[in-house]
Amino acid sequence: MENNTEDINEVESIETVTTGYEPREPQKEIHKAIKDNRWVTAICHRRMGKTVCAINQLIHSALNCTKESPQLAYIAPTYSQAKRIAWGYLKDYTRPLGGIANESELRVDFLGRRISLYGADSPDALRGIYLDGCVIDEYGDVHPSLFTEVLRPALSDRLGWALFIGTPKGSNHFKELRDFADNPSNEG
C-alpha cells in the first residue's frame, strides 16, 4: 500500500489527540486502507499491534461517523477471546473520551456512539443489529458465513466498512479473500 504523507498526518493527528494512540507504520497503512476502501484485508505478523490498531480504528470511525447513533463492533473467534484480547484496550482508549463501559455486555458508550465486542462463536448475538463498521479479528478462524449471512446485512443499510484482520495460517478462506483482494481485475 502506498502512503500519501498528507493522509498519514491526518490519521496521526486524529488518533493521537483523542486517545493517545500513536500508530506505527504498518498500522498507518491499515488506517489509510480503511479510509480509502469499504472492505479491507490485513495479514499481520504476530506482535504487530493489530488489536490496538483495530480498536483505535473503531474509535476513530465512531468519532467521525455522521450518522445517528453509530454502532461498531470488534469480533473475535470466541467471546472469551474478544474479552481477553480487546476489552482492556477498548476501555483504556475510550476513557479520555468519557467512555462508559458495560462489563456484562462488553460494550463502551461514548459521545452518543457505541462499540461492542462479540464472539463469532455466537453469531445470533449479531443478528438484527446495524453496524457502521466492524473488525473481524483472526478471520481465518471464523466461519466465512458469519460475514456473508450476518455481518454484511448488518453493514448494508448504513454502508458500513469491514476490516478482515489476522495472522497467516496457511491456505484457508482468509488467504482466499486476500488473494481476491490483491487481484487488480477485482477492483471496483
Regions found by a protein language model. Give the residues of each.
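Phosphate/NTP-binding elements of NTP-utilizing enzymes
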Residues: 2-188
